[in-house]
Amino acid sequence: MVGTAKAKQLTHFCLTEHMPRLTDQYLYPEELEKGYTVANLKANFENYLTHARRIQARENLAGQIQILVGFEVEGIDLAHIELASMFKKQTDMCIGSVHYVHGIPIDFDREQWDMARTASGGTTRALYKDYFNLQYEVIRALKPDVIGHFDLIRLFQEDEIDQTGRLLSEIDVERDWPDVWELIVRNIKLVVSYGGLFELNSSAIRKGWLTPYPRKDLARAIVKFGGNFCLSDDSHAYKQVALNYHRVWEYVQELGLTHIYHLELNSLGKTIVAEDSVAALSELTFWDQYK
């Protein structure tokens, strides 16, 4: 992964791993098929931290790329949020994410997404509210450095008839679901208040979206309320490193962003937020690899 990041001319790269879950009931179907238990997840995470710190020491000394070591929060419930606060002390940064609602994965497949919606009362609107309320608890308790895939709840949403009588694709969340929009704005304002960043996460494109997370309505809301963006590939394999960043950059320009932000370590080893001009970044030879 790091070798690919260097080959692709990245100057800063954050290694992350999902924090372990507390009980076997939260294992994904693919993990169950492999015979995993939470003990495996805990051991894997501990091994990750050791290995990542070793890579970080080597690469940061060499100076070609700066590596940060972080983790991704599993904002399943308050117990997992409390566990995440412990891991936060051991890492350079954390990504605040929600992958479960009512203990059910919302990013694995449509069937489980439907189960989560049923648990929320059977409507997509109610599921959105539960998702953004849980996300708020993650943000409030942990103040994550980066908010992960802000609107992940949309990944498996199909274009169905809403209670308003319109297709979901025709729903303007701000106008038609003001109760949901209020929660979204609340979450954005909280992140802005402590200086957190929002991902422009390119993994949505490889999963079939036309844009990164978040989609344009929420991205514009983040801009409106003073939020800042960083780039993320959410890579789970070396072939996904910086994948579709050229399309993310088109999105950056569509949004009219003037600056993009990233995390880095200062001379004291403290994680800080750094700012780069979109105009200057656009001139880098980095983009030649996408032509």
Residue positions per predicted region:
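Charged catalytic cores and adjacent phosphate/nucleic-acid-binding surfaces used
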Residues: 1, 154-156, 160-291
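Histidine/acidic residue-rich metal-binding segments in metalloenzymes
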Residues: 2-3, 44, 49-61, 66-68, ...
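Hydrophobic faces of well-ordered beta-strands that scaffold small-molecule active sites
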Residues: 13-15, 67-71, 94-96, 146-148, ...
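Short, well-ordered alpha-helical microsegments
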Residues: 76-79, 215
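A short acidic, often aromatic-flanked loop/helix-cap motif at beta-alpha or helix-coil junctions
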Residues: 76, 103, 267-270
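Short, conserved acidic/polar surface loops in the N-terminal third of protein domains
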Residues: 26, 78-83, 105-109
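An N-terminally biased module of ancient metal coordination in phosphate/nucleic-acid-related enzymes
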Residues: 1-77, 86, 161-178, 202, ...
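Divalent metal-binding pocket/active-site signature
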Residues: 20-22, 89, 93-189, 197-200, ...
